[in-house]
Amino acid sequence: MSERLLVLVRHGQSEWNLKNLFTGWKDPDLTEQGVAEAREAGRKLKAQGLVFDVAYTSVLTRAQHTLDLILGELGQKGLPTEKNLALNERDYGDLSGLNKDDARKKWGEDQVLIWRRSYDVPPPGGESLKDTLARALPYYVQEILPSVLNGKRTLVAAHGNSLRALIMVLEKLSPEGILKRELATGVPIIYRLNADSTVASKLDLAG
């Protein structure tokens, strides 16, 4: 029986995470801490005895750099990798590049909270979580999931909100449930799937 392995990891801390800025499709790189988080993710996966056949990531530097560092720790630098904007972070539109405290001053605490935490209300010029799922989910179903079900050990390095789309399907969460799910930077989540694509086991490598 082939192993149906899927590992998800959010990119390590970025320069804009550190500065408390809305990032979205803007393209800052990792901080020193983010680099360390990505390397630690690779070491944790190696300690689990994992190797991969294929990887998927976004077109944004912070996710690609995270993937590269993980693969370096695994000794798998040449791993076939698909890069697709379907896995990009949620586009925060007019909020992109703004300090979160400054955004609260401009639009008010309640409005910014609605944009950040509601399922289907987008910020001006940007995407809601529902919009993000609408592009990430088809990519998962059409590209990533068939790879896993065909026995390819699959690693996905992406972003908090695009990974929420995958987790929503994997764990059968409601919109309310996925909104409450926080994903730490640089922490791998290991799923093993049944033949019908349901989750057989899950291991979160936090800590």
UniProtKB/Swiss-Prot annotation:
Its EC number is 5.4.2.11. GO terms for biological process: gluconeogenesis; glycolytic process. The active site is at H11, E89. SUPFAM superfamilies: Phosphoglycerate mutase-like (SSF53254). Pathway: Carbohydrate degradation; glycolysis; pyruvate from D-glyceraldehyde 3-phosphate: step 3/5. Substrate binds at residues 10-17, 23-24, 62, 89-92, 100, 116-117, 160-161. The keyword Metal-binding does not apply. Catalyzes the interconversion of 2-phosphoglycerate and 3-phosphoglycerate. This is 2,3-bisphosphoglycerate-dependent phosphoglycerate mutase. It comes from Bradyrhizobium diazoefficiens (strain JCM 10833 / BCRC 13528 / IAM 13628 / NBRC 14792 / USDA 110).
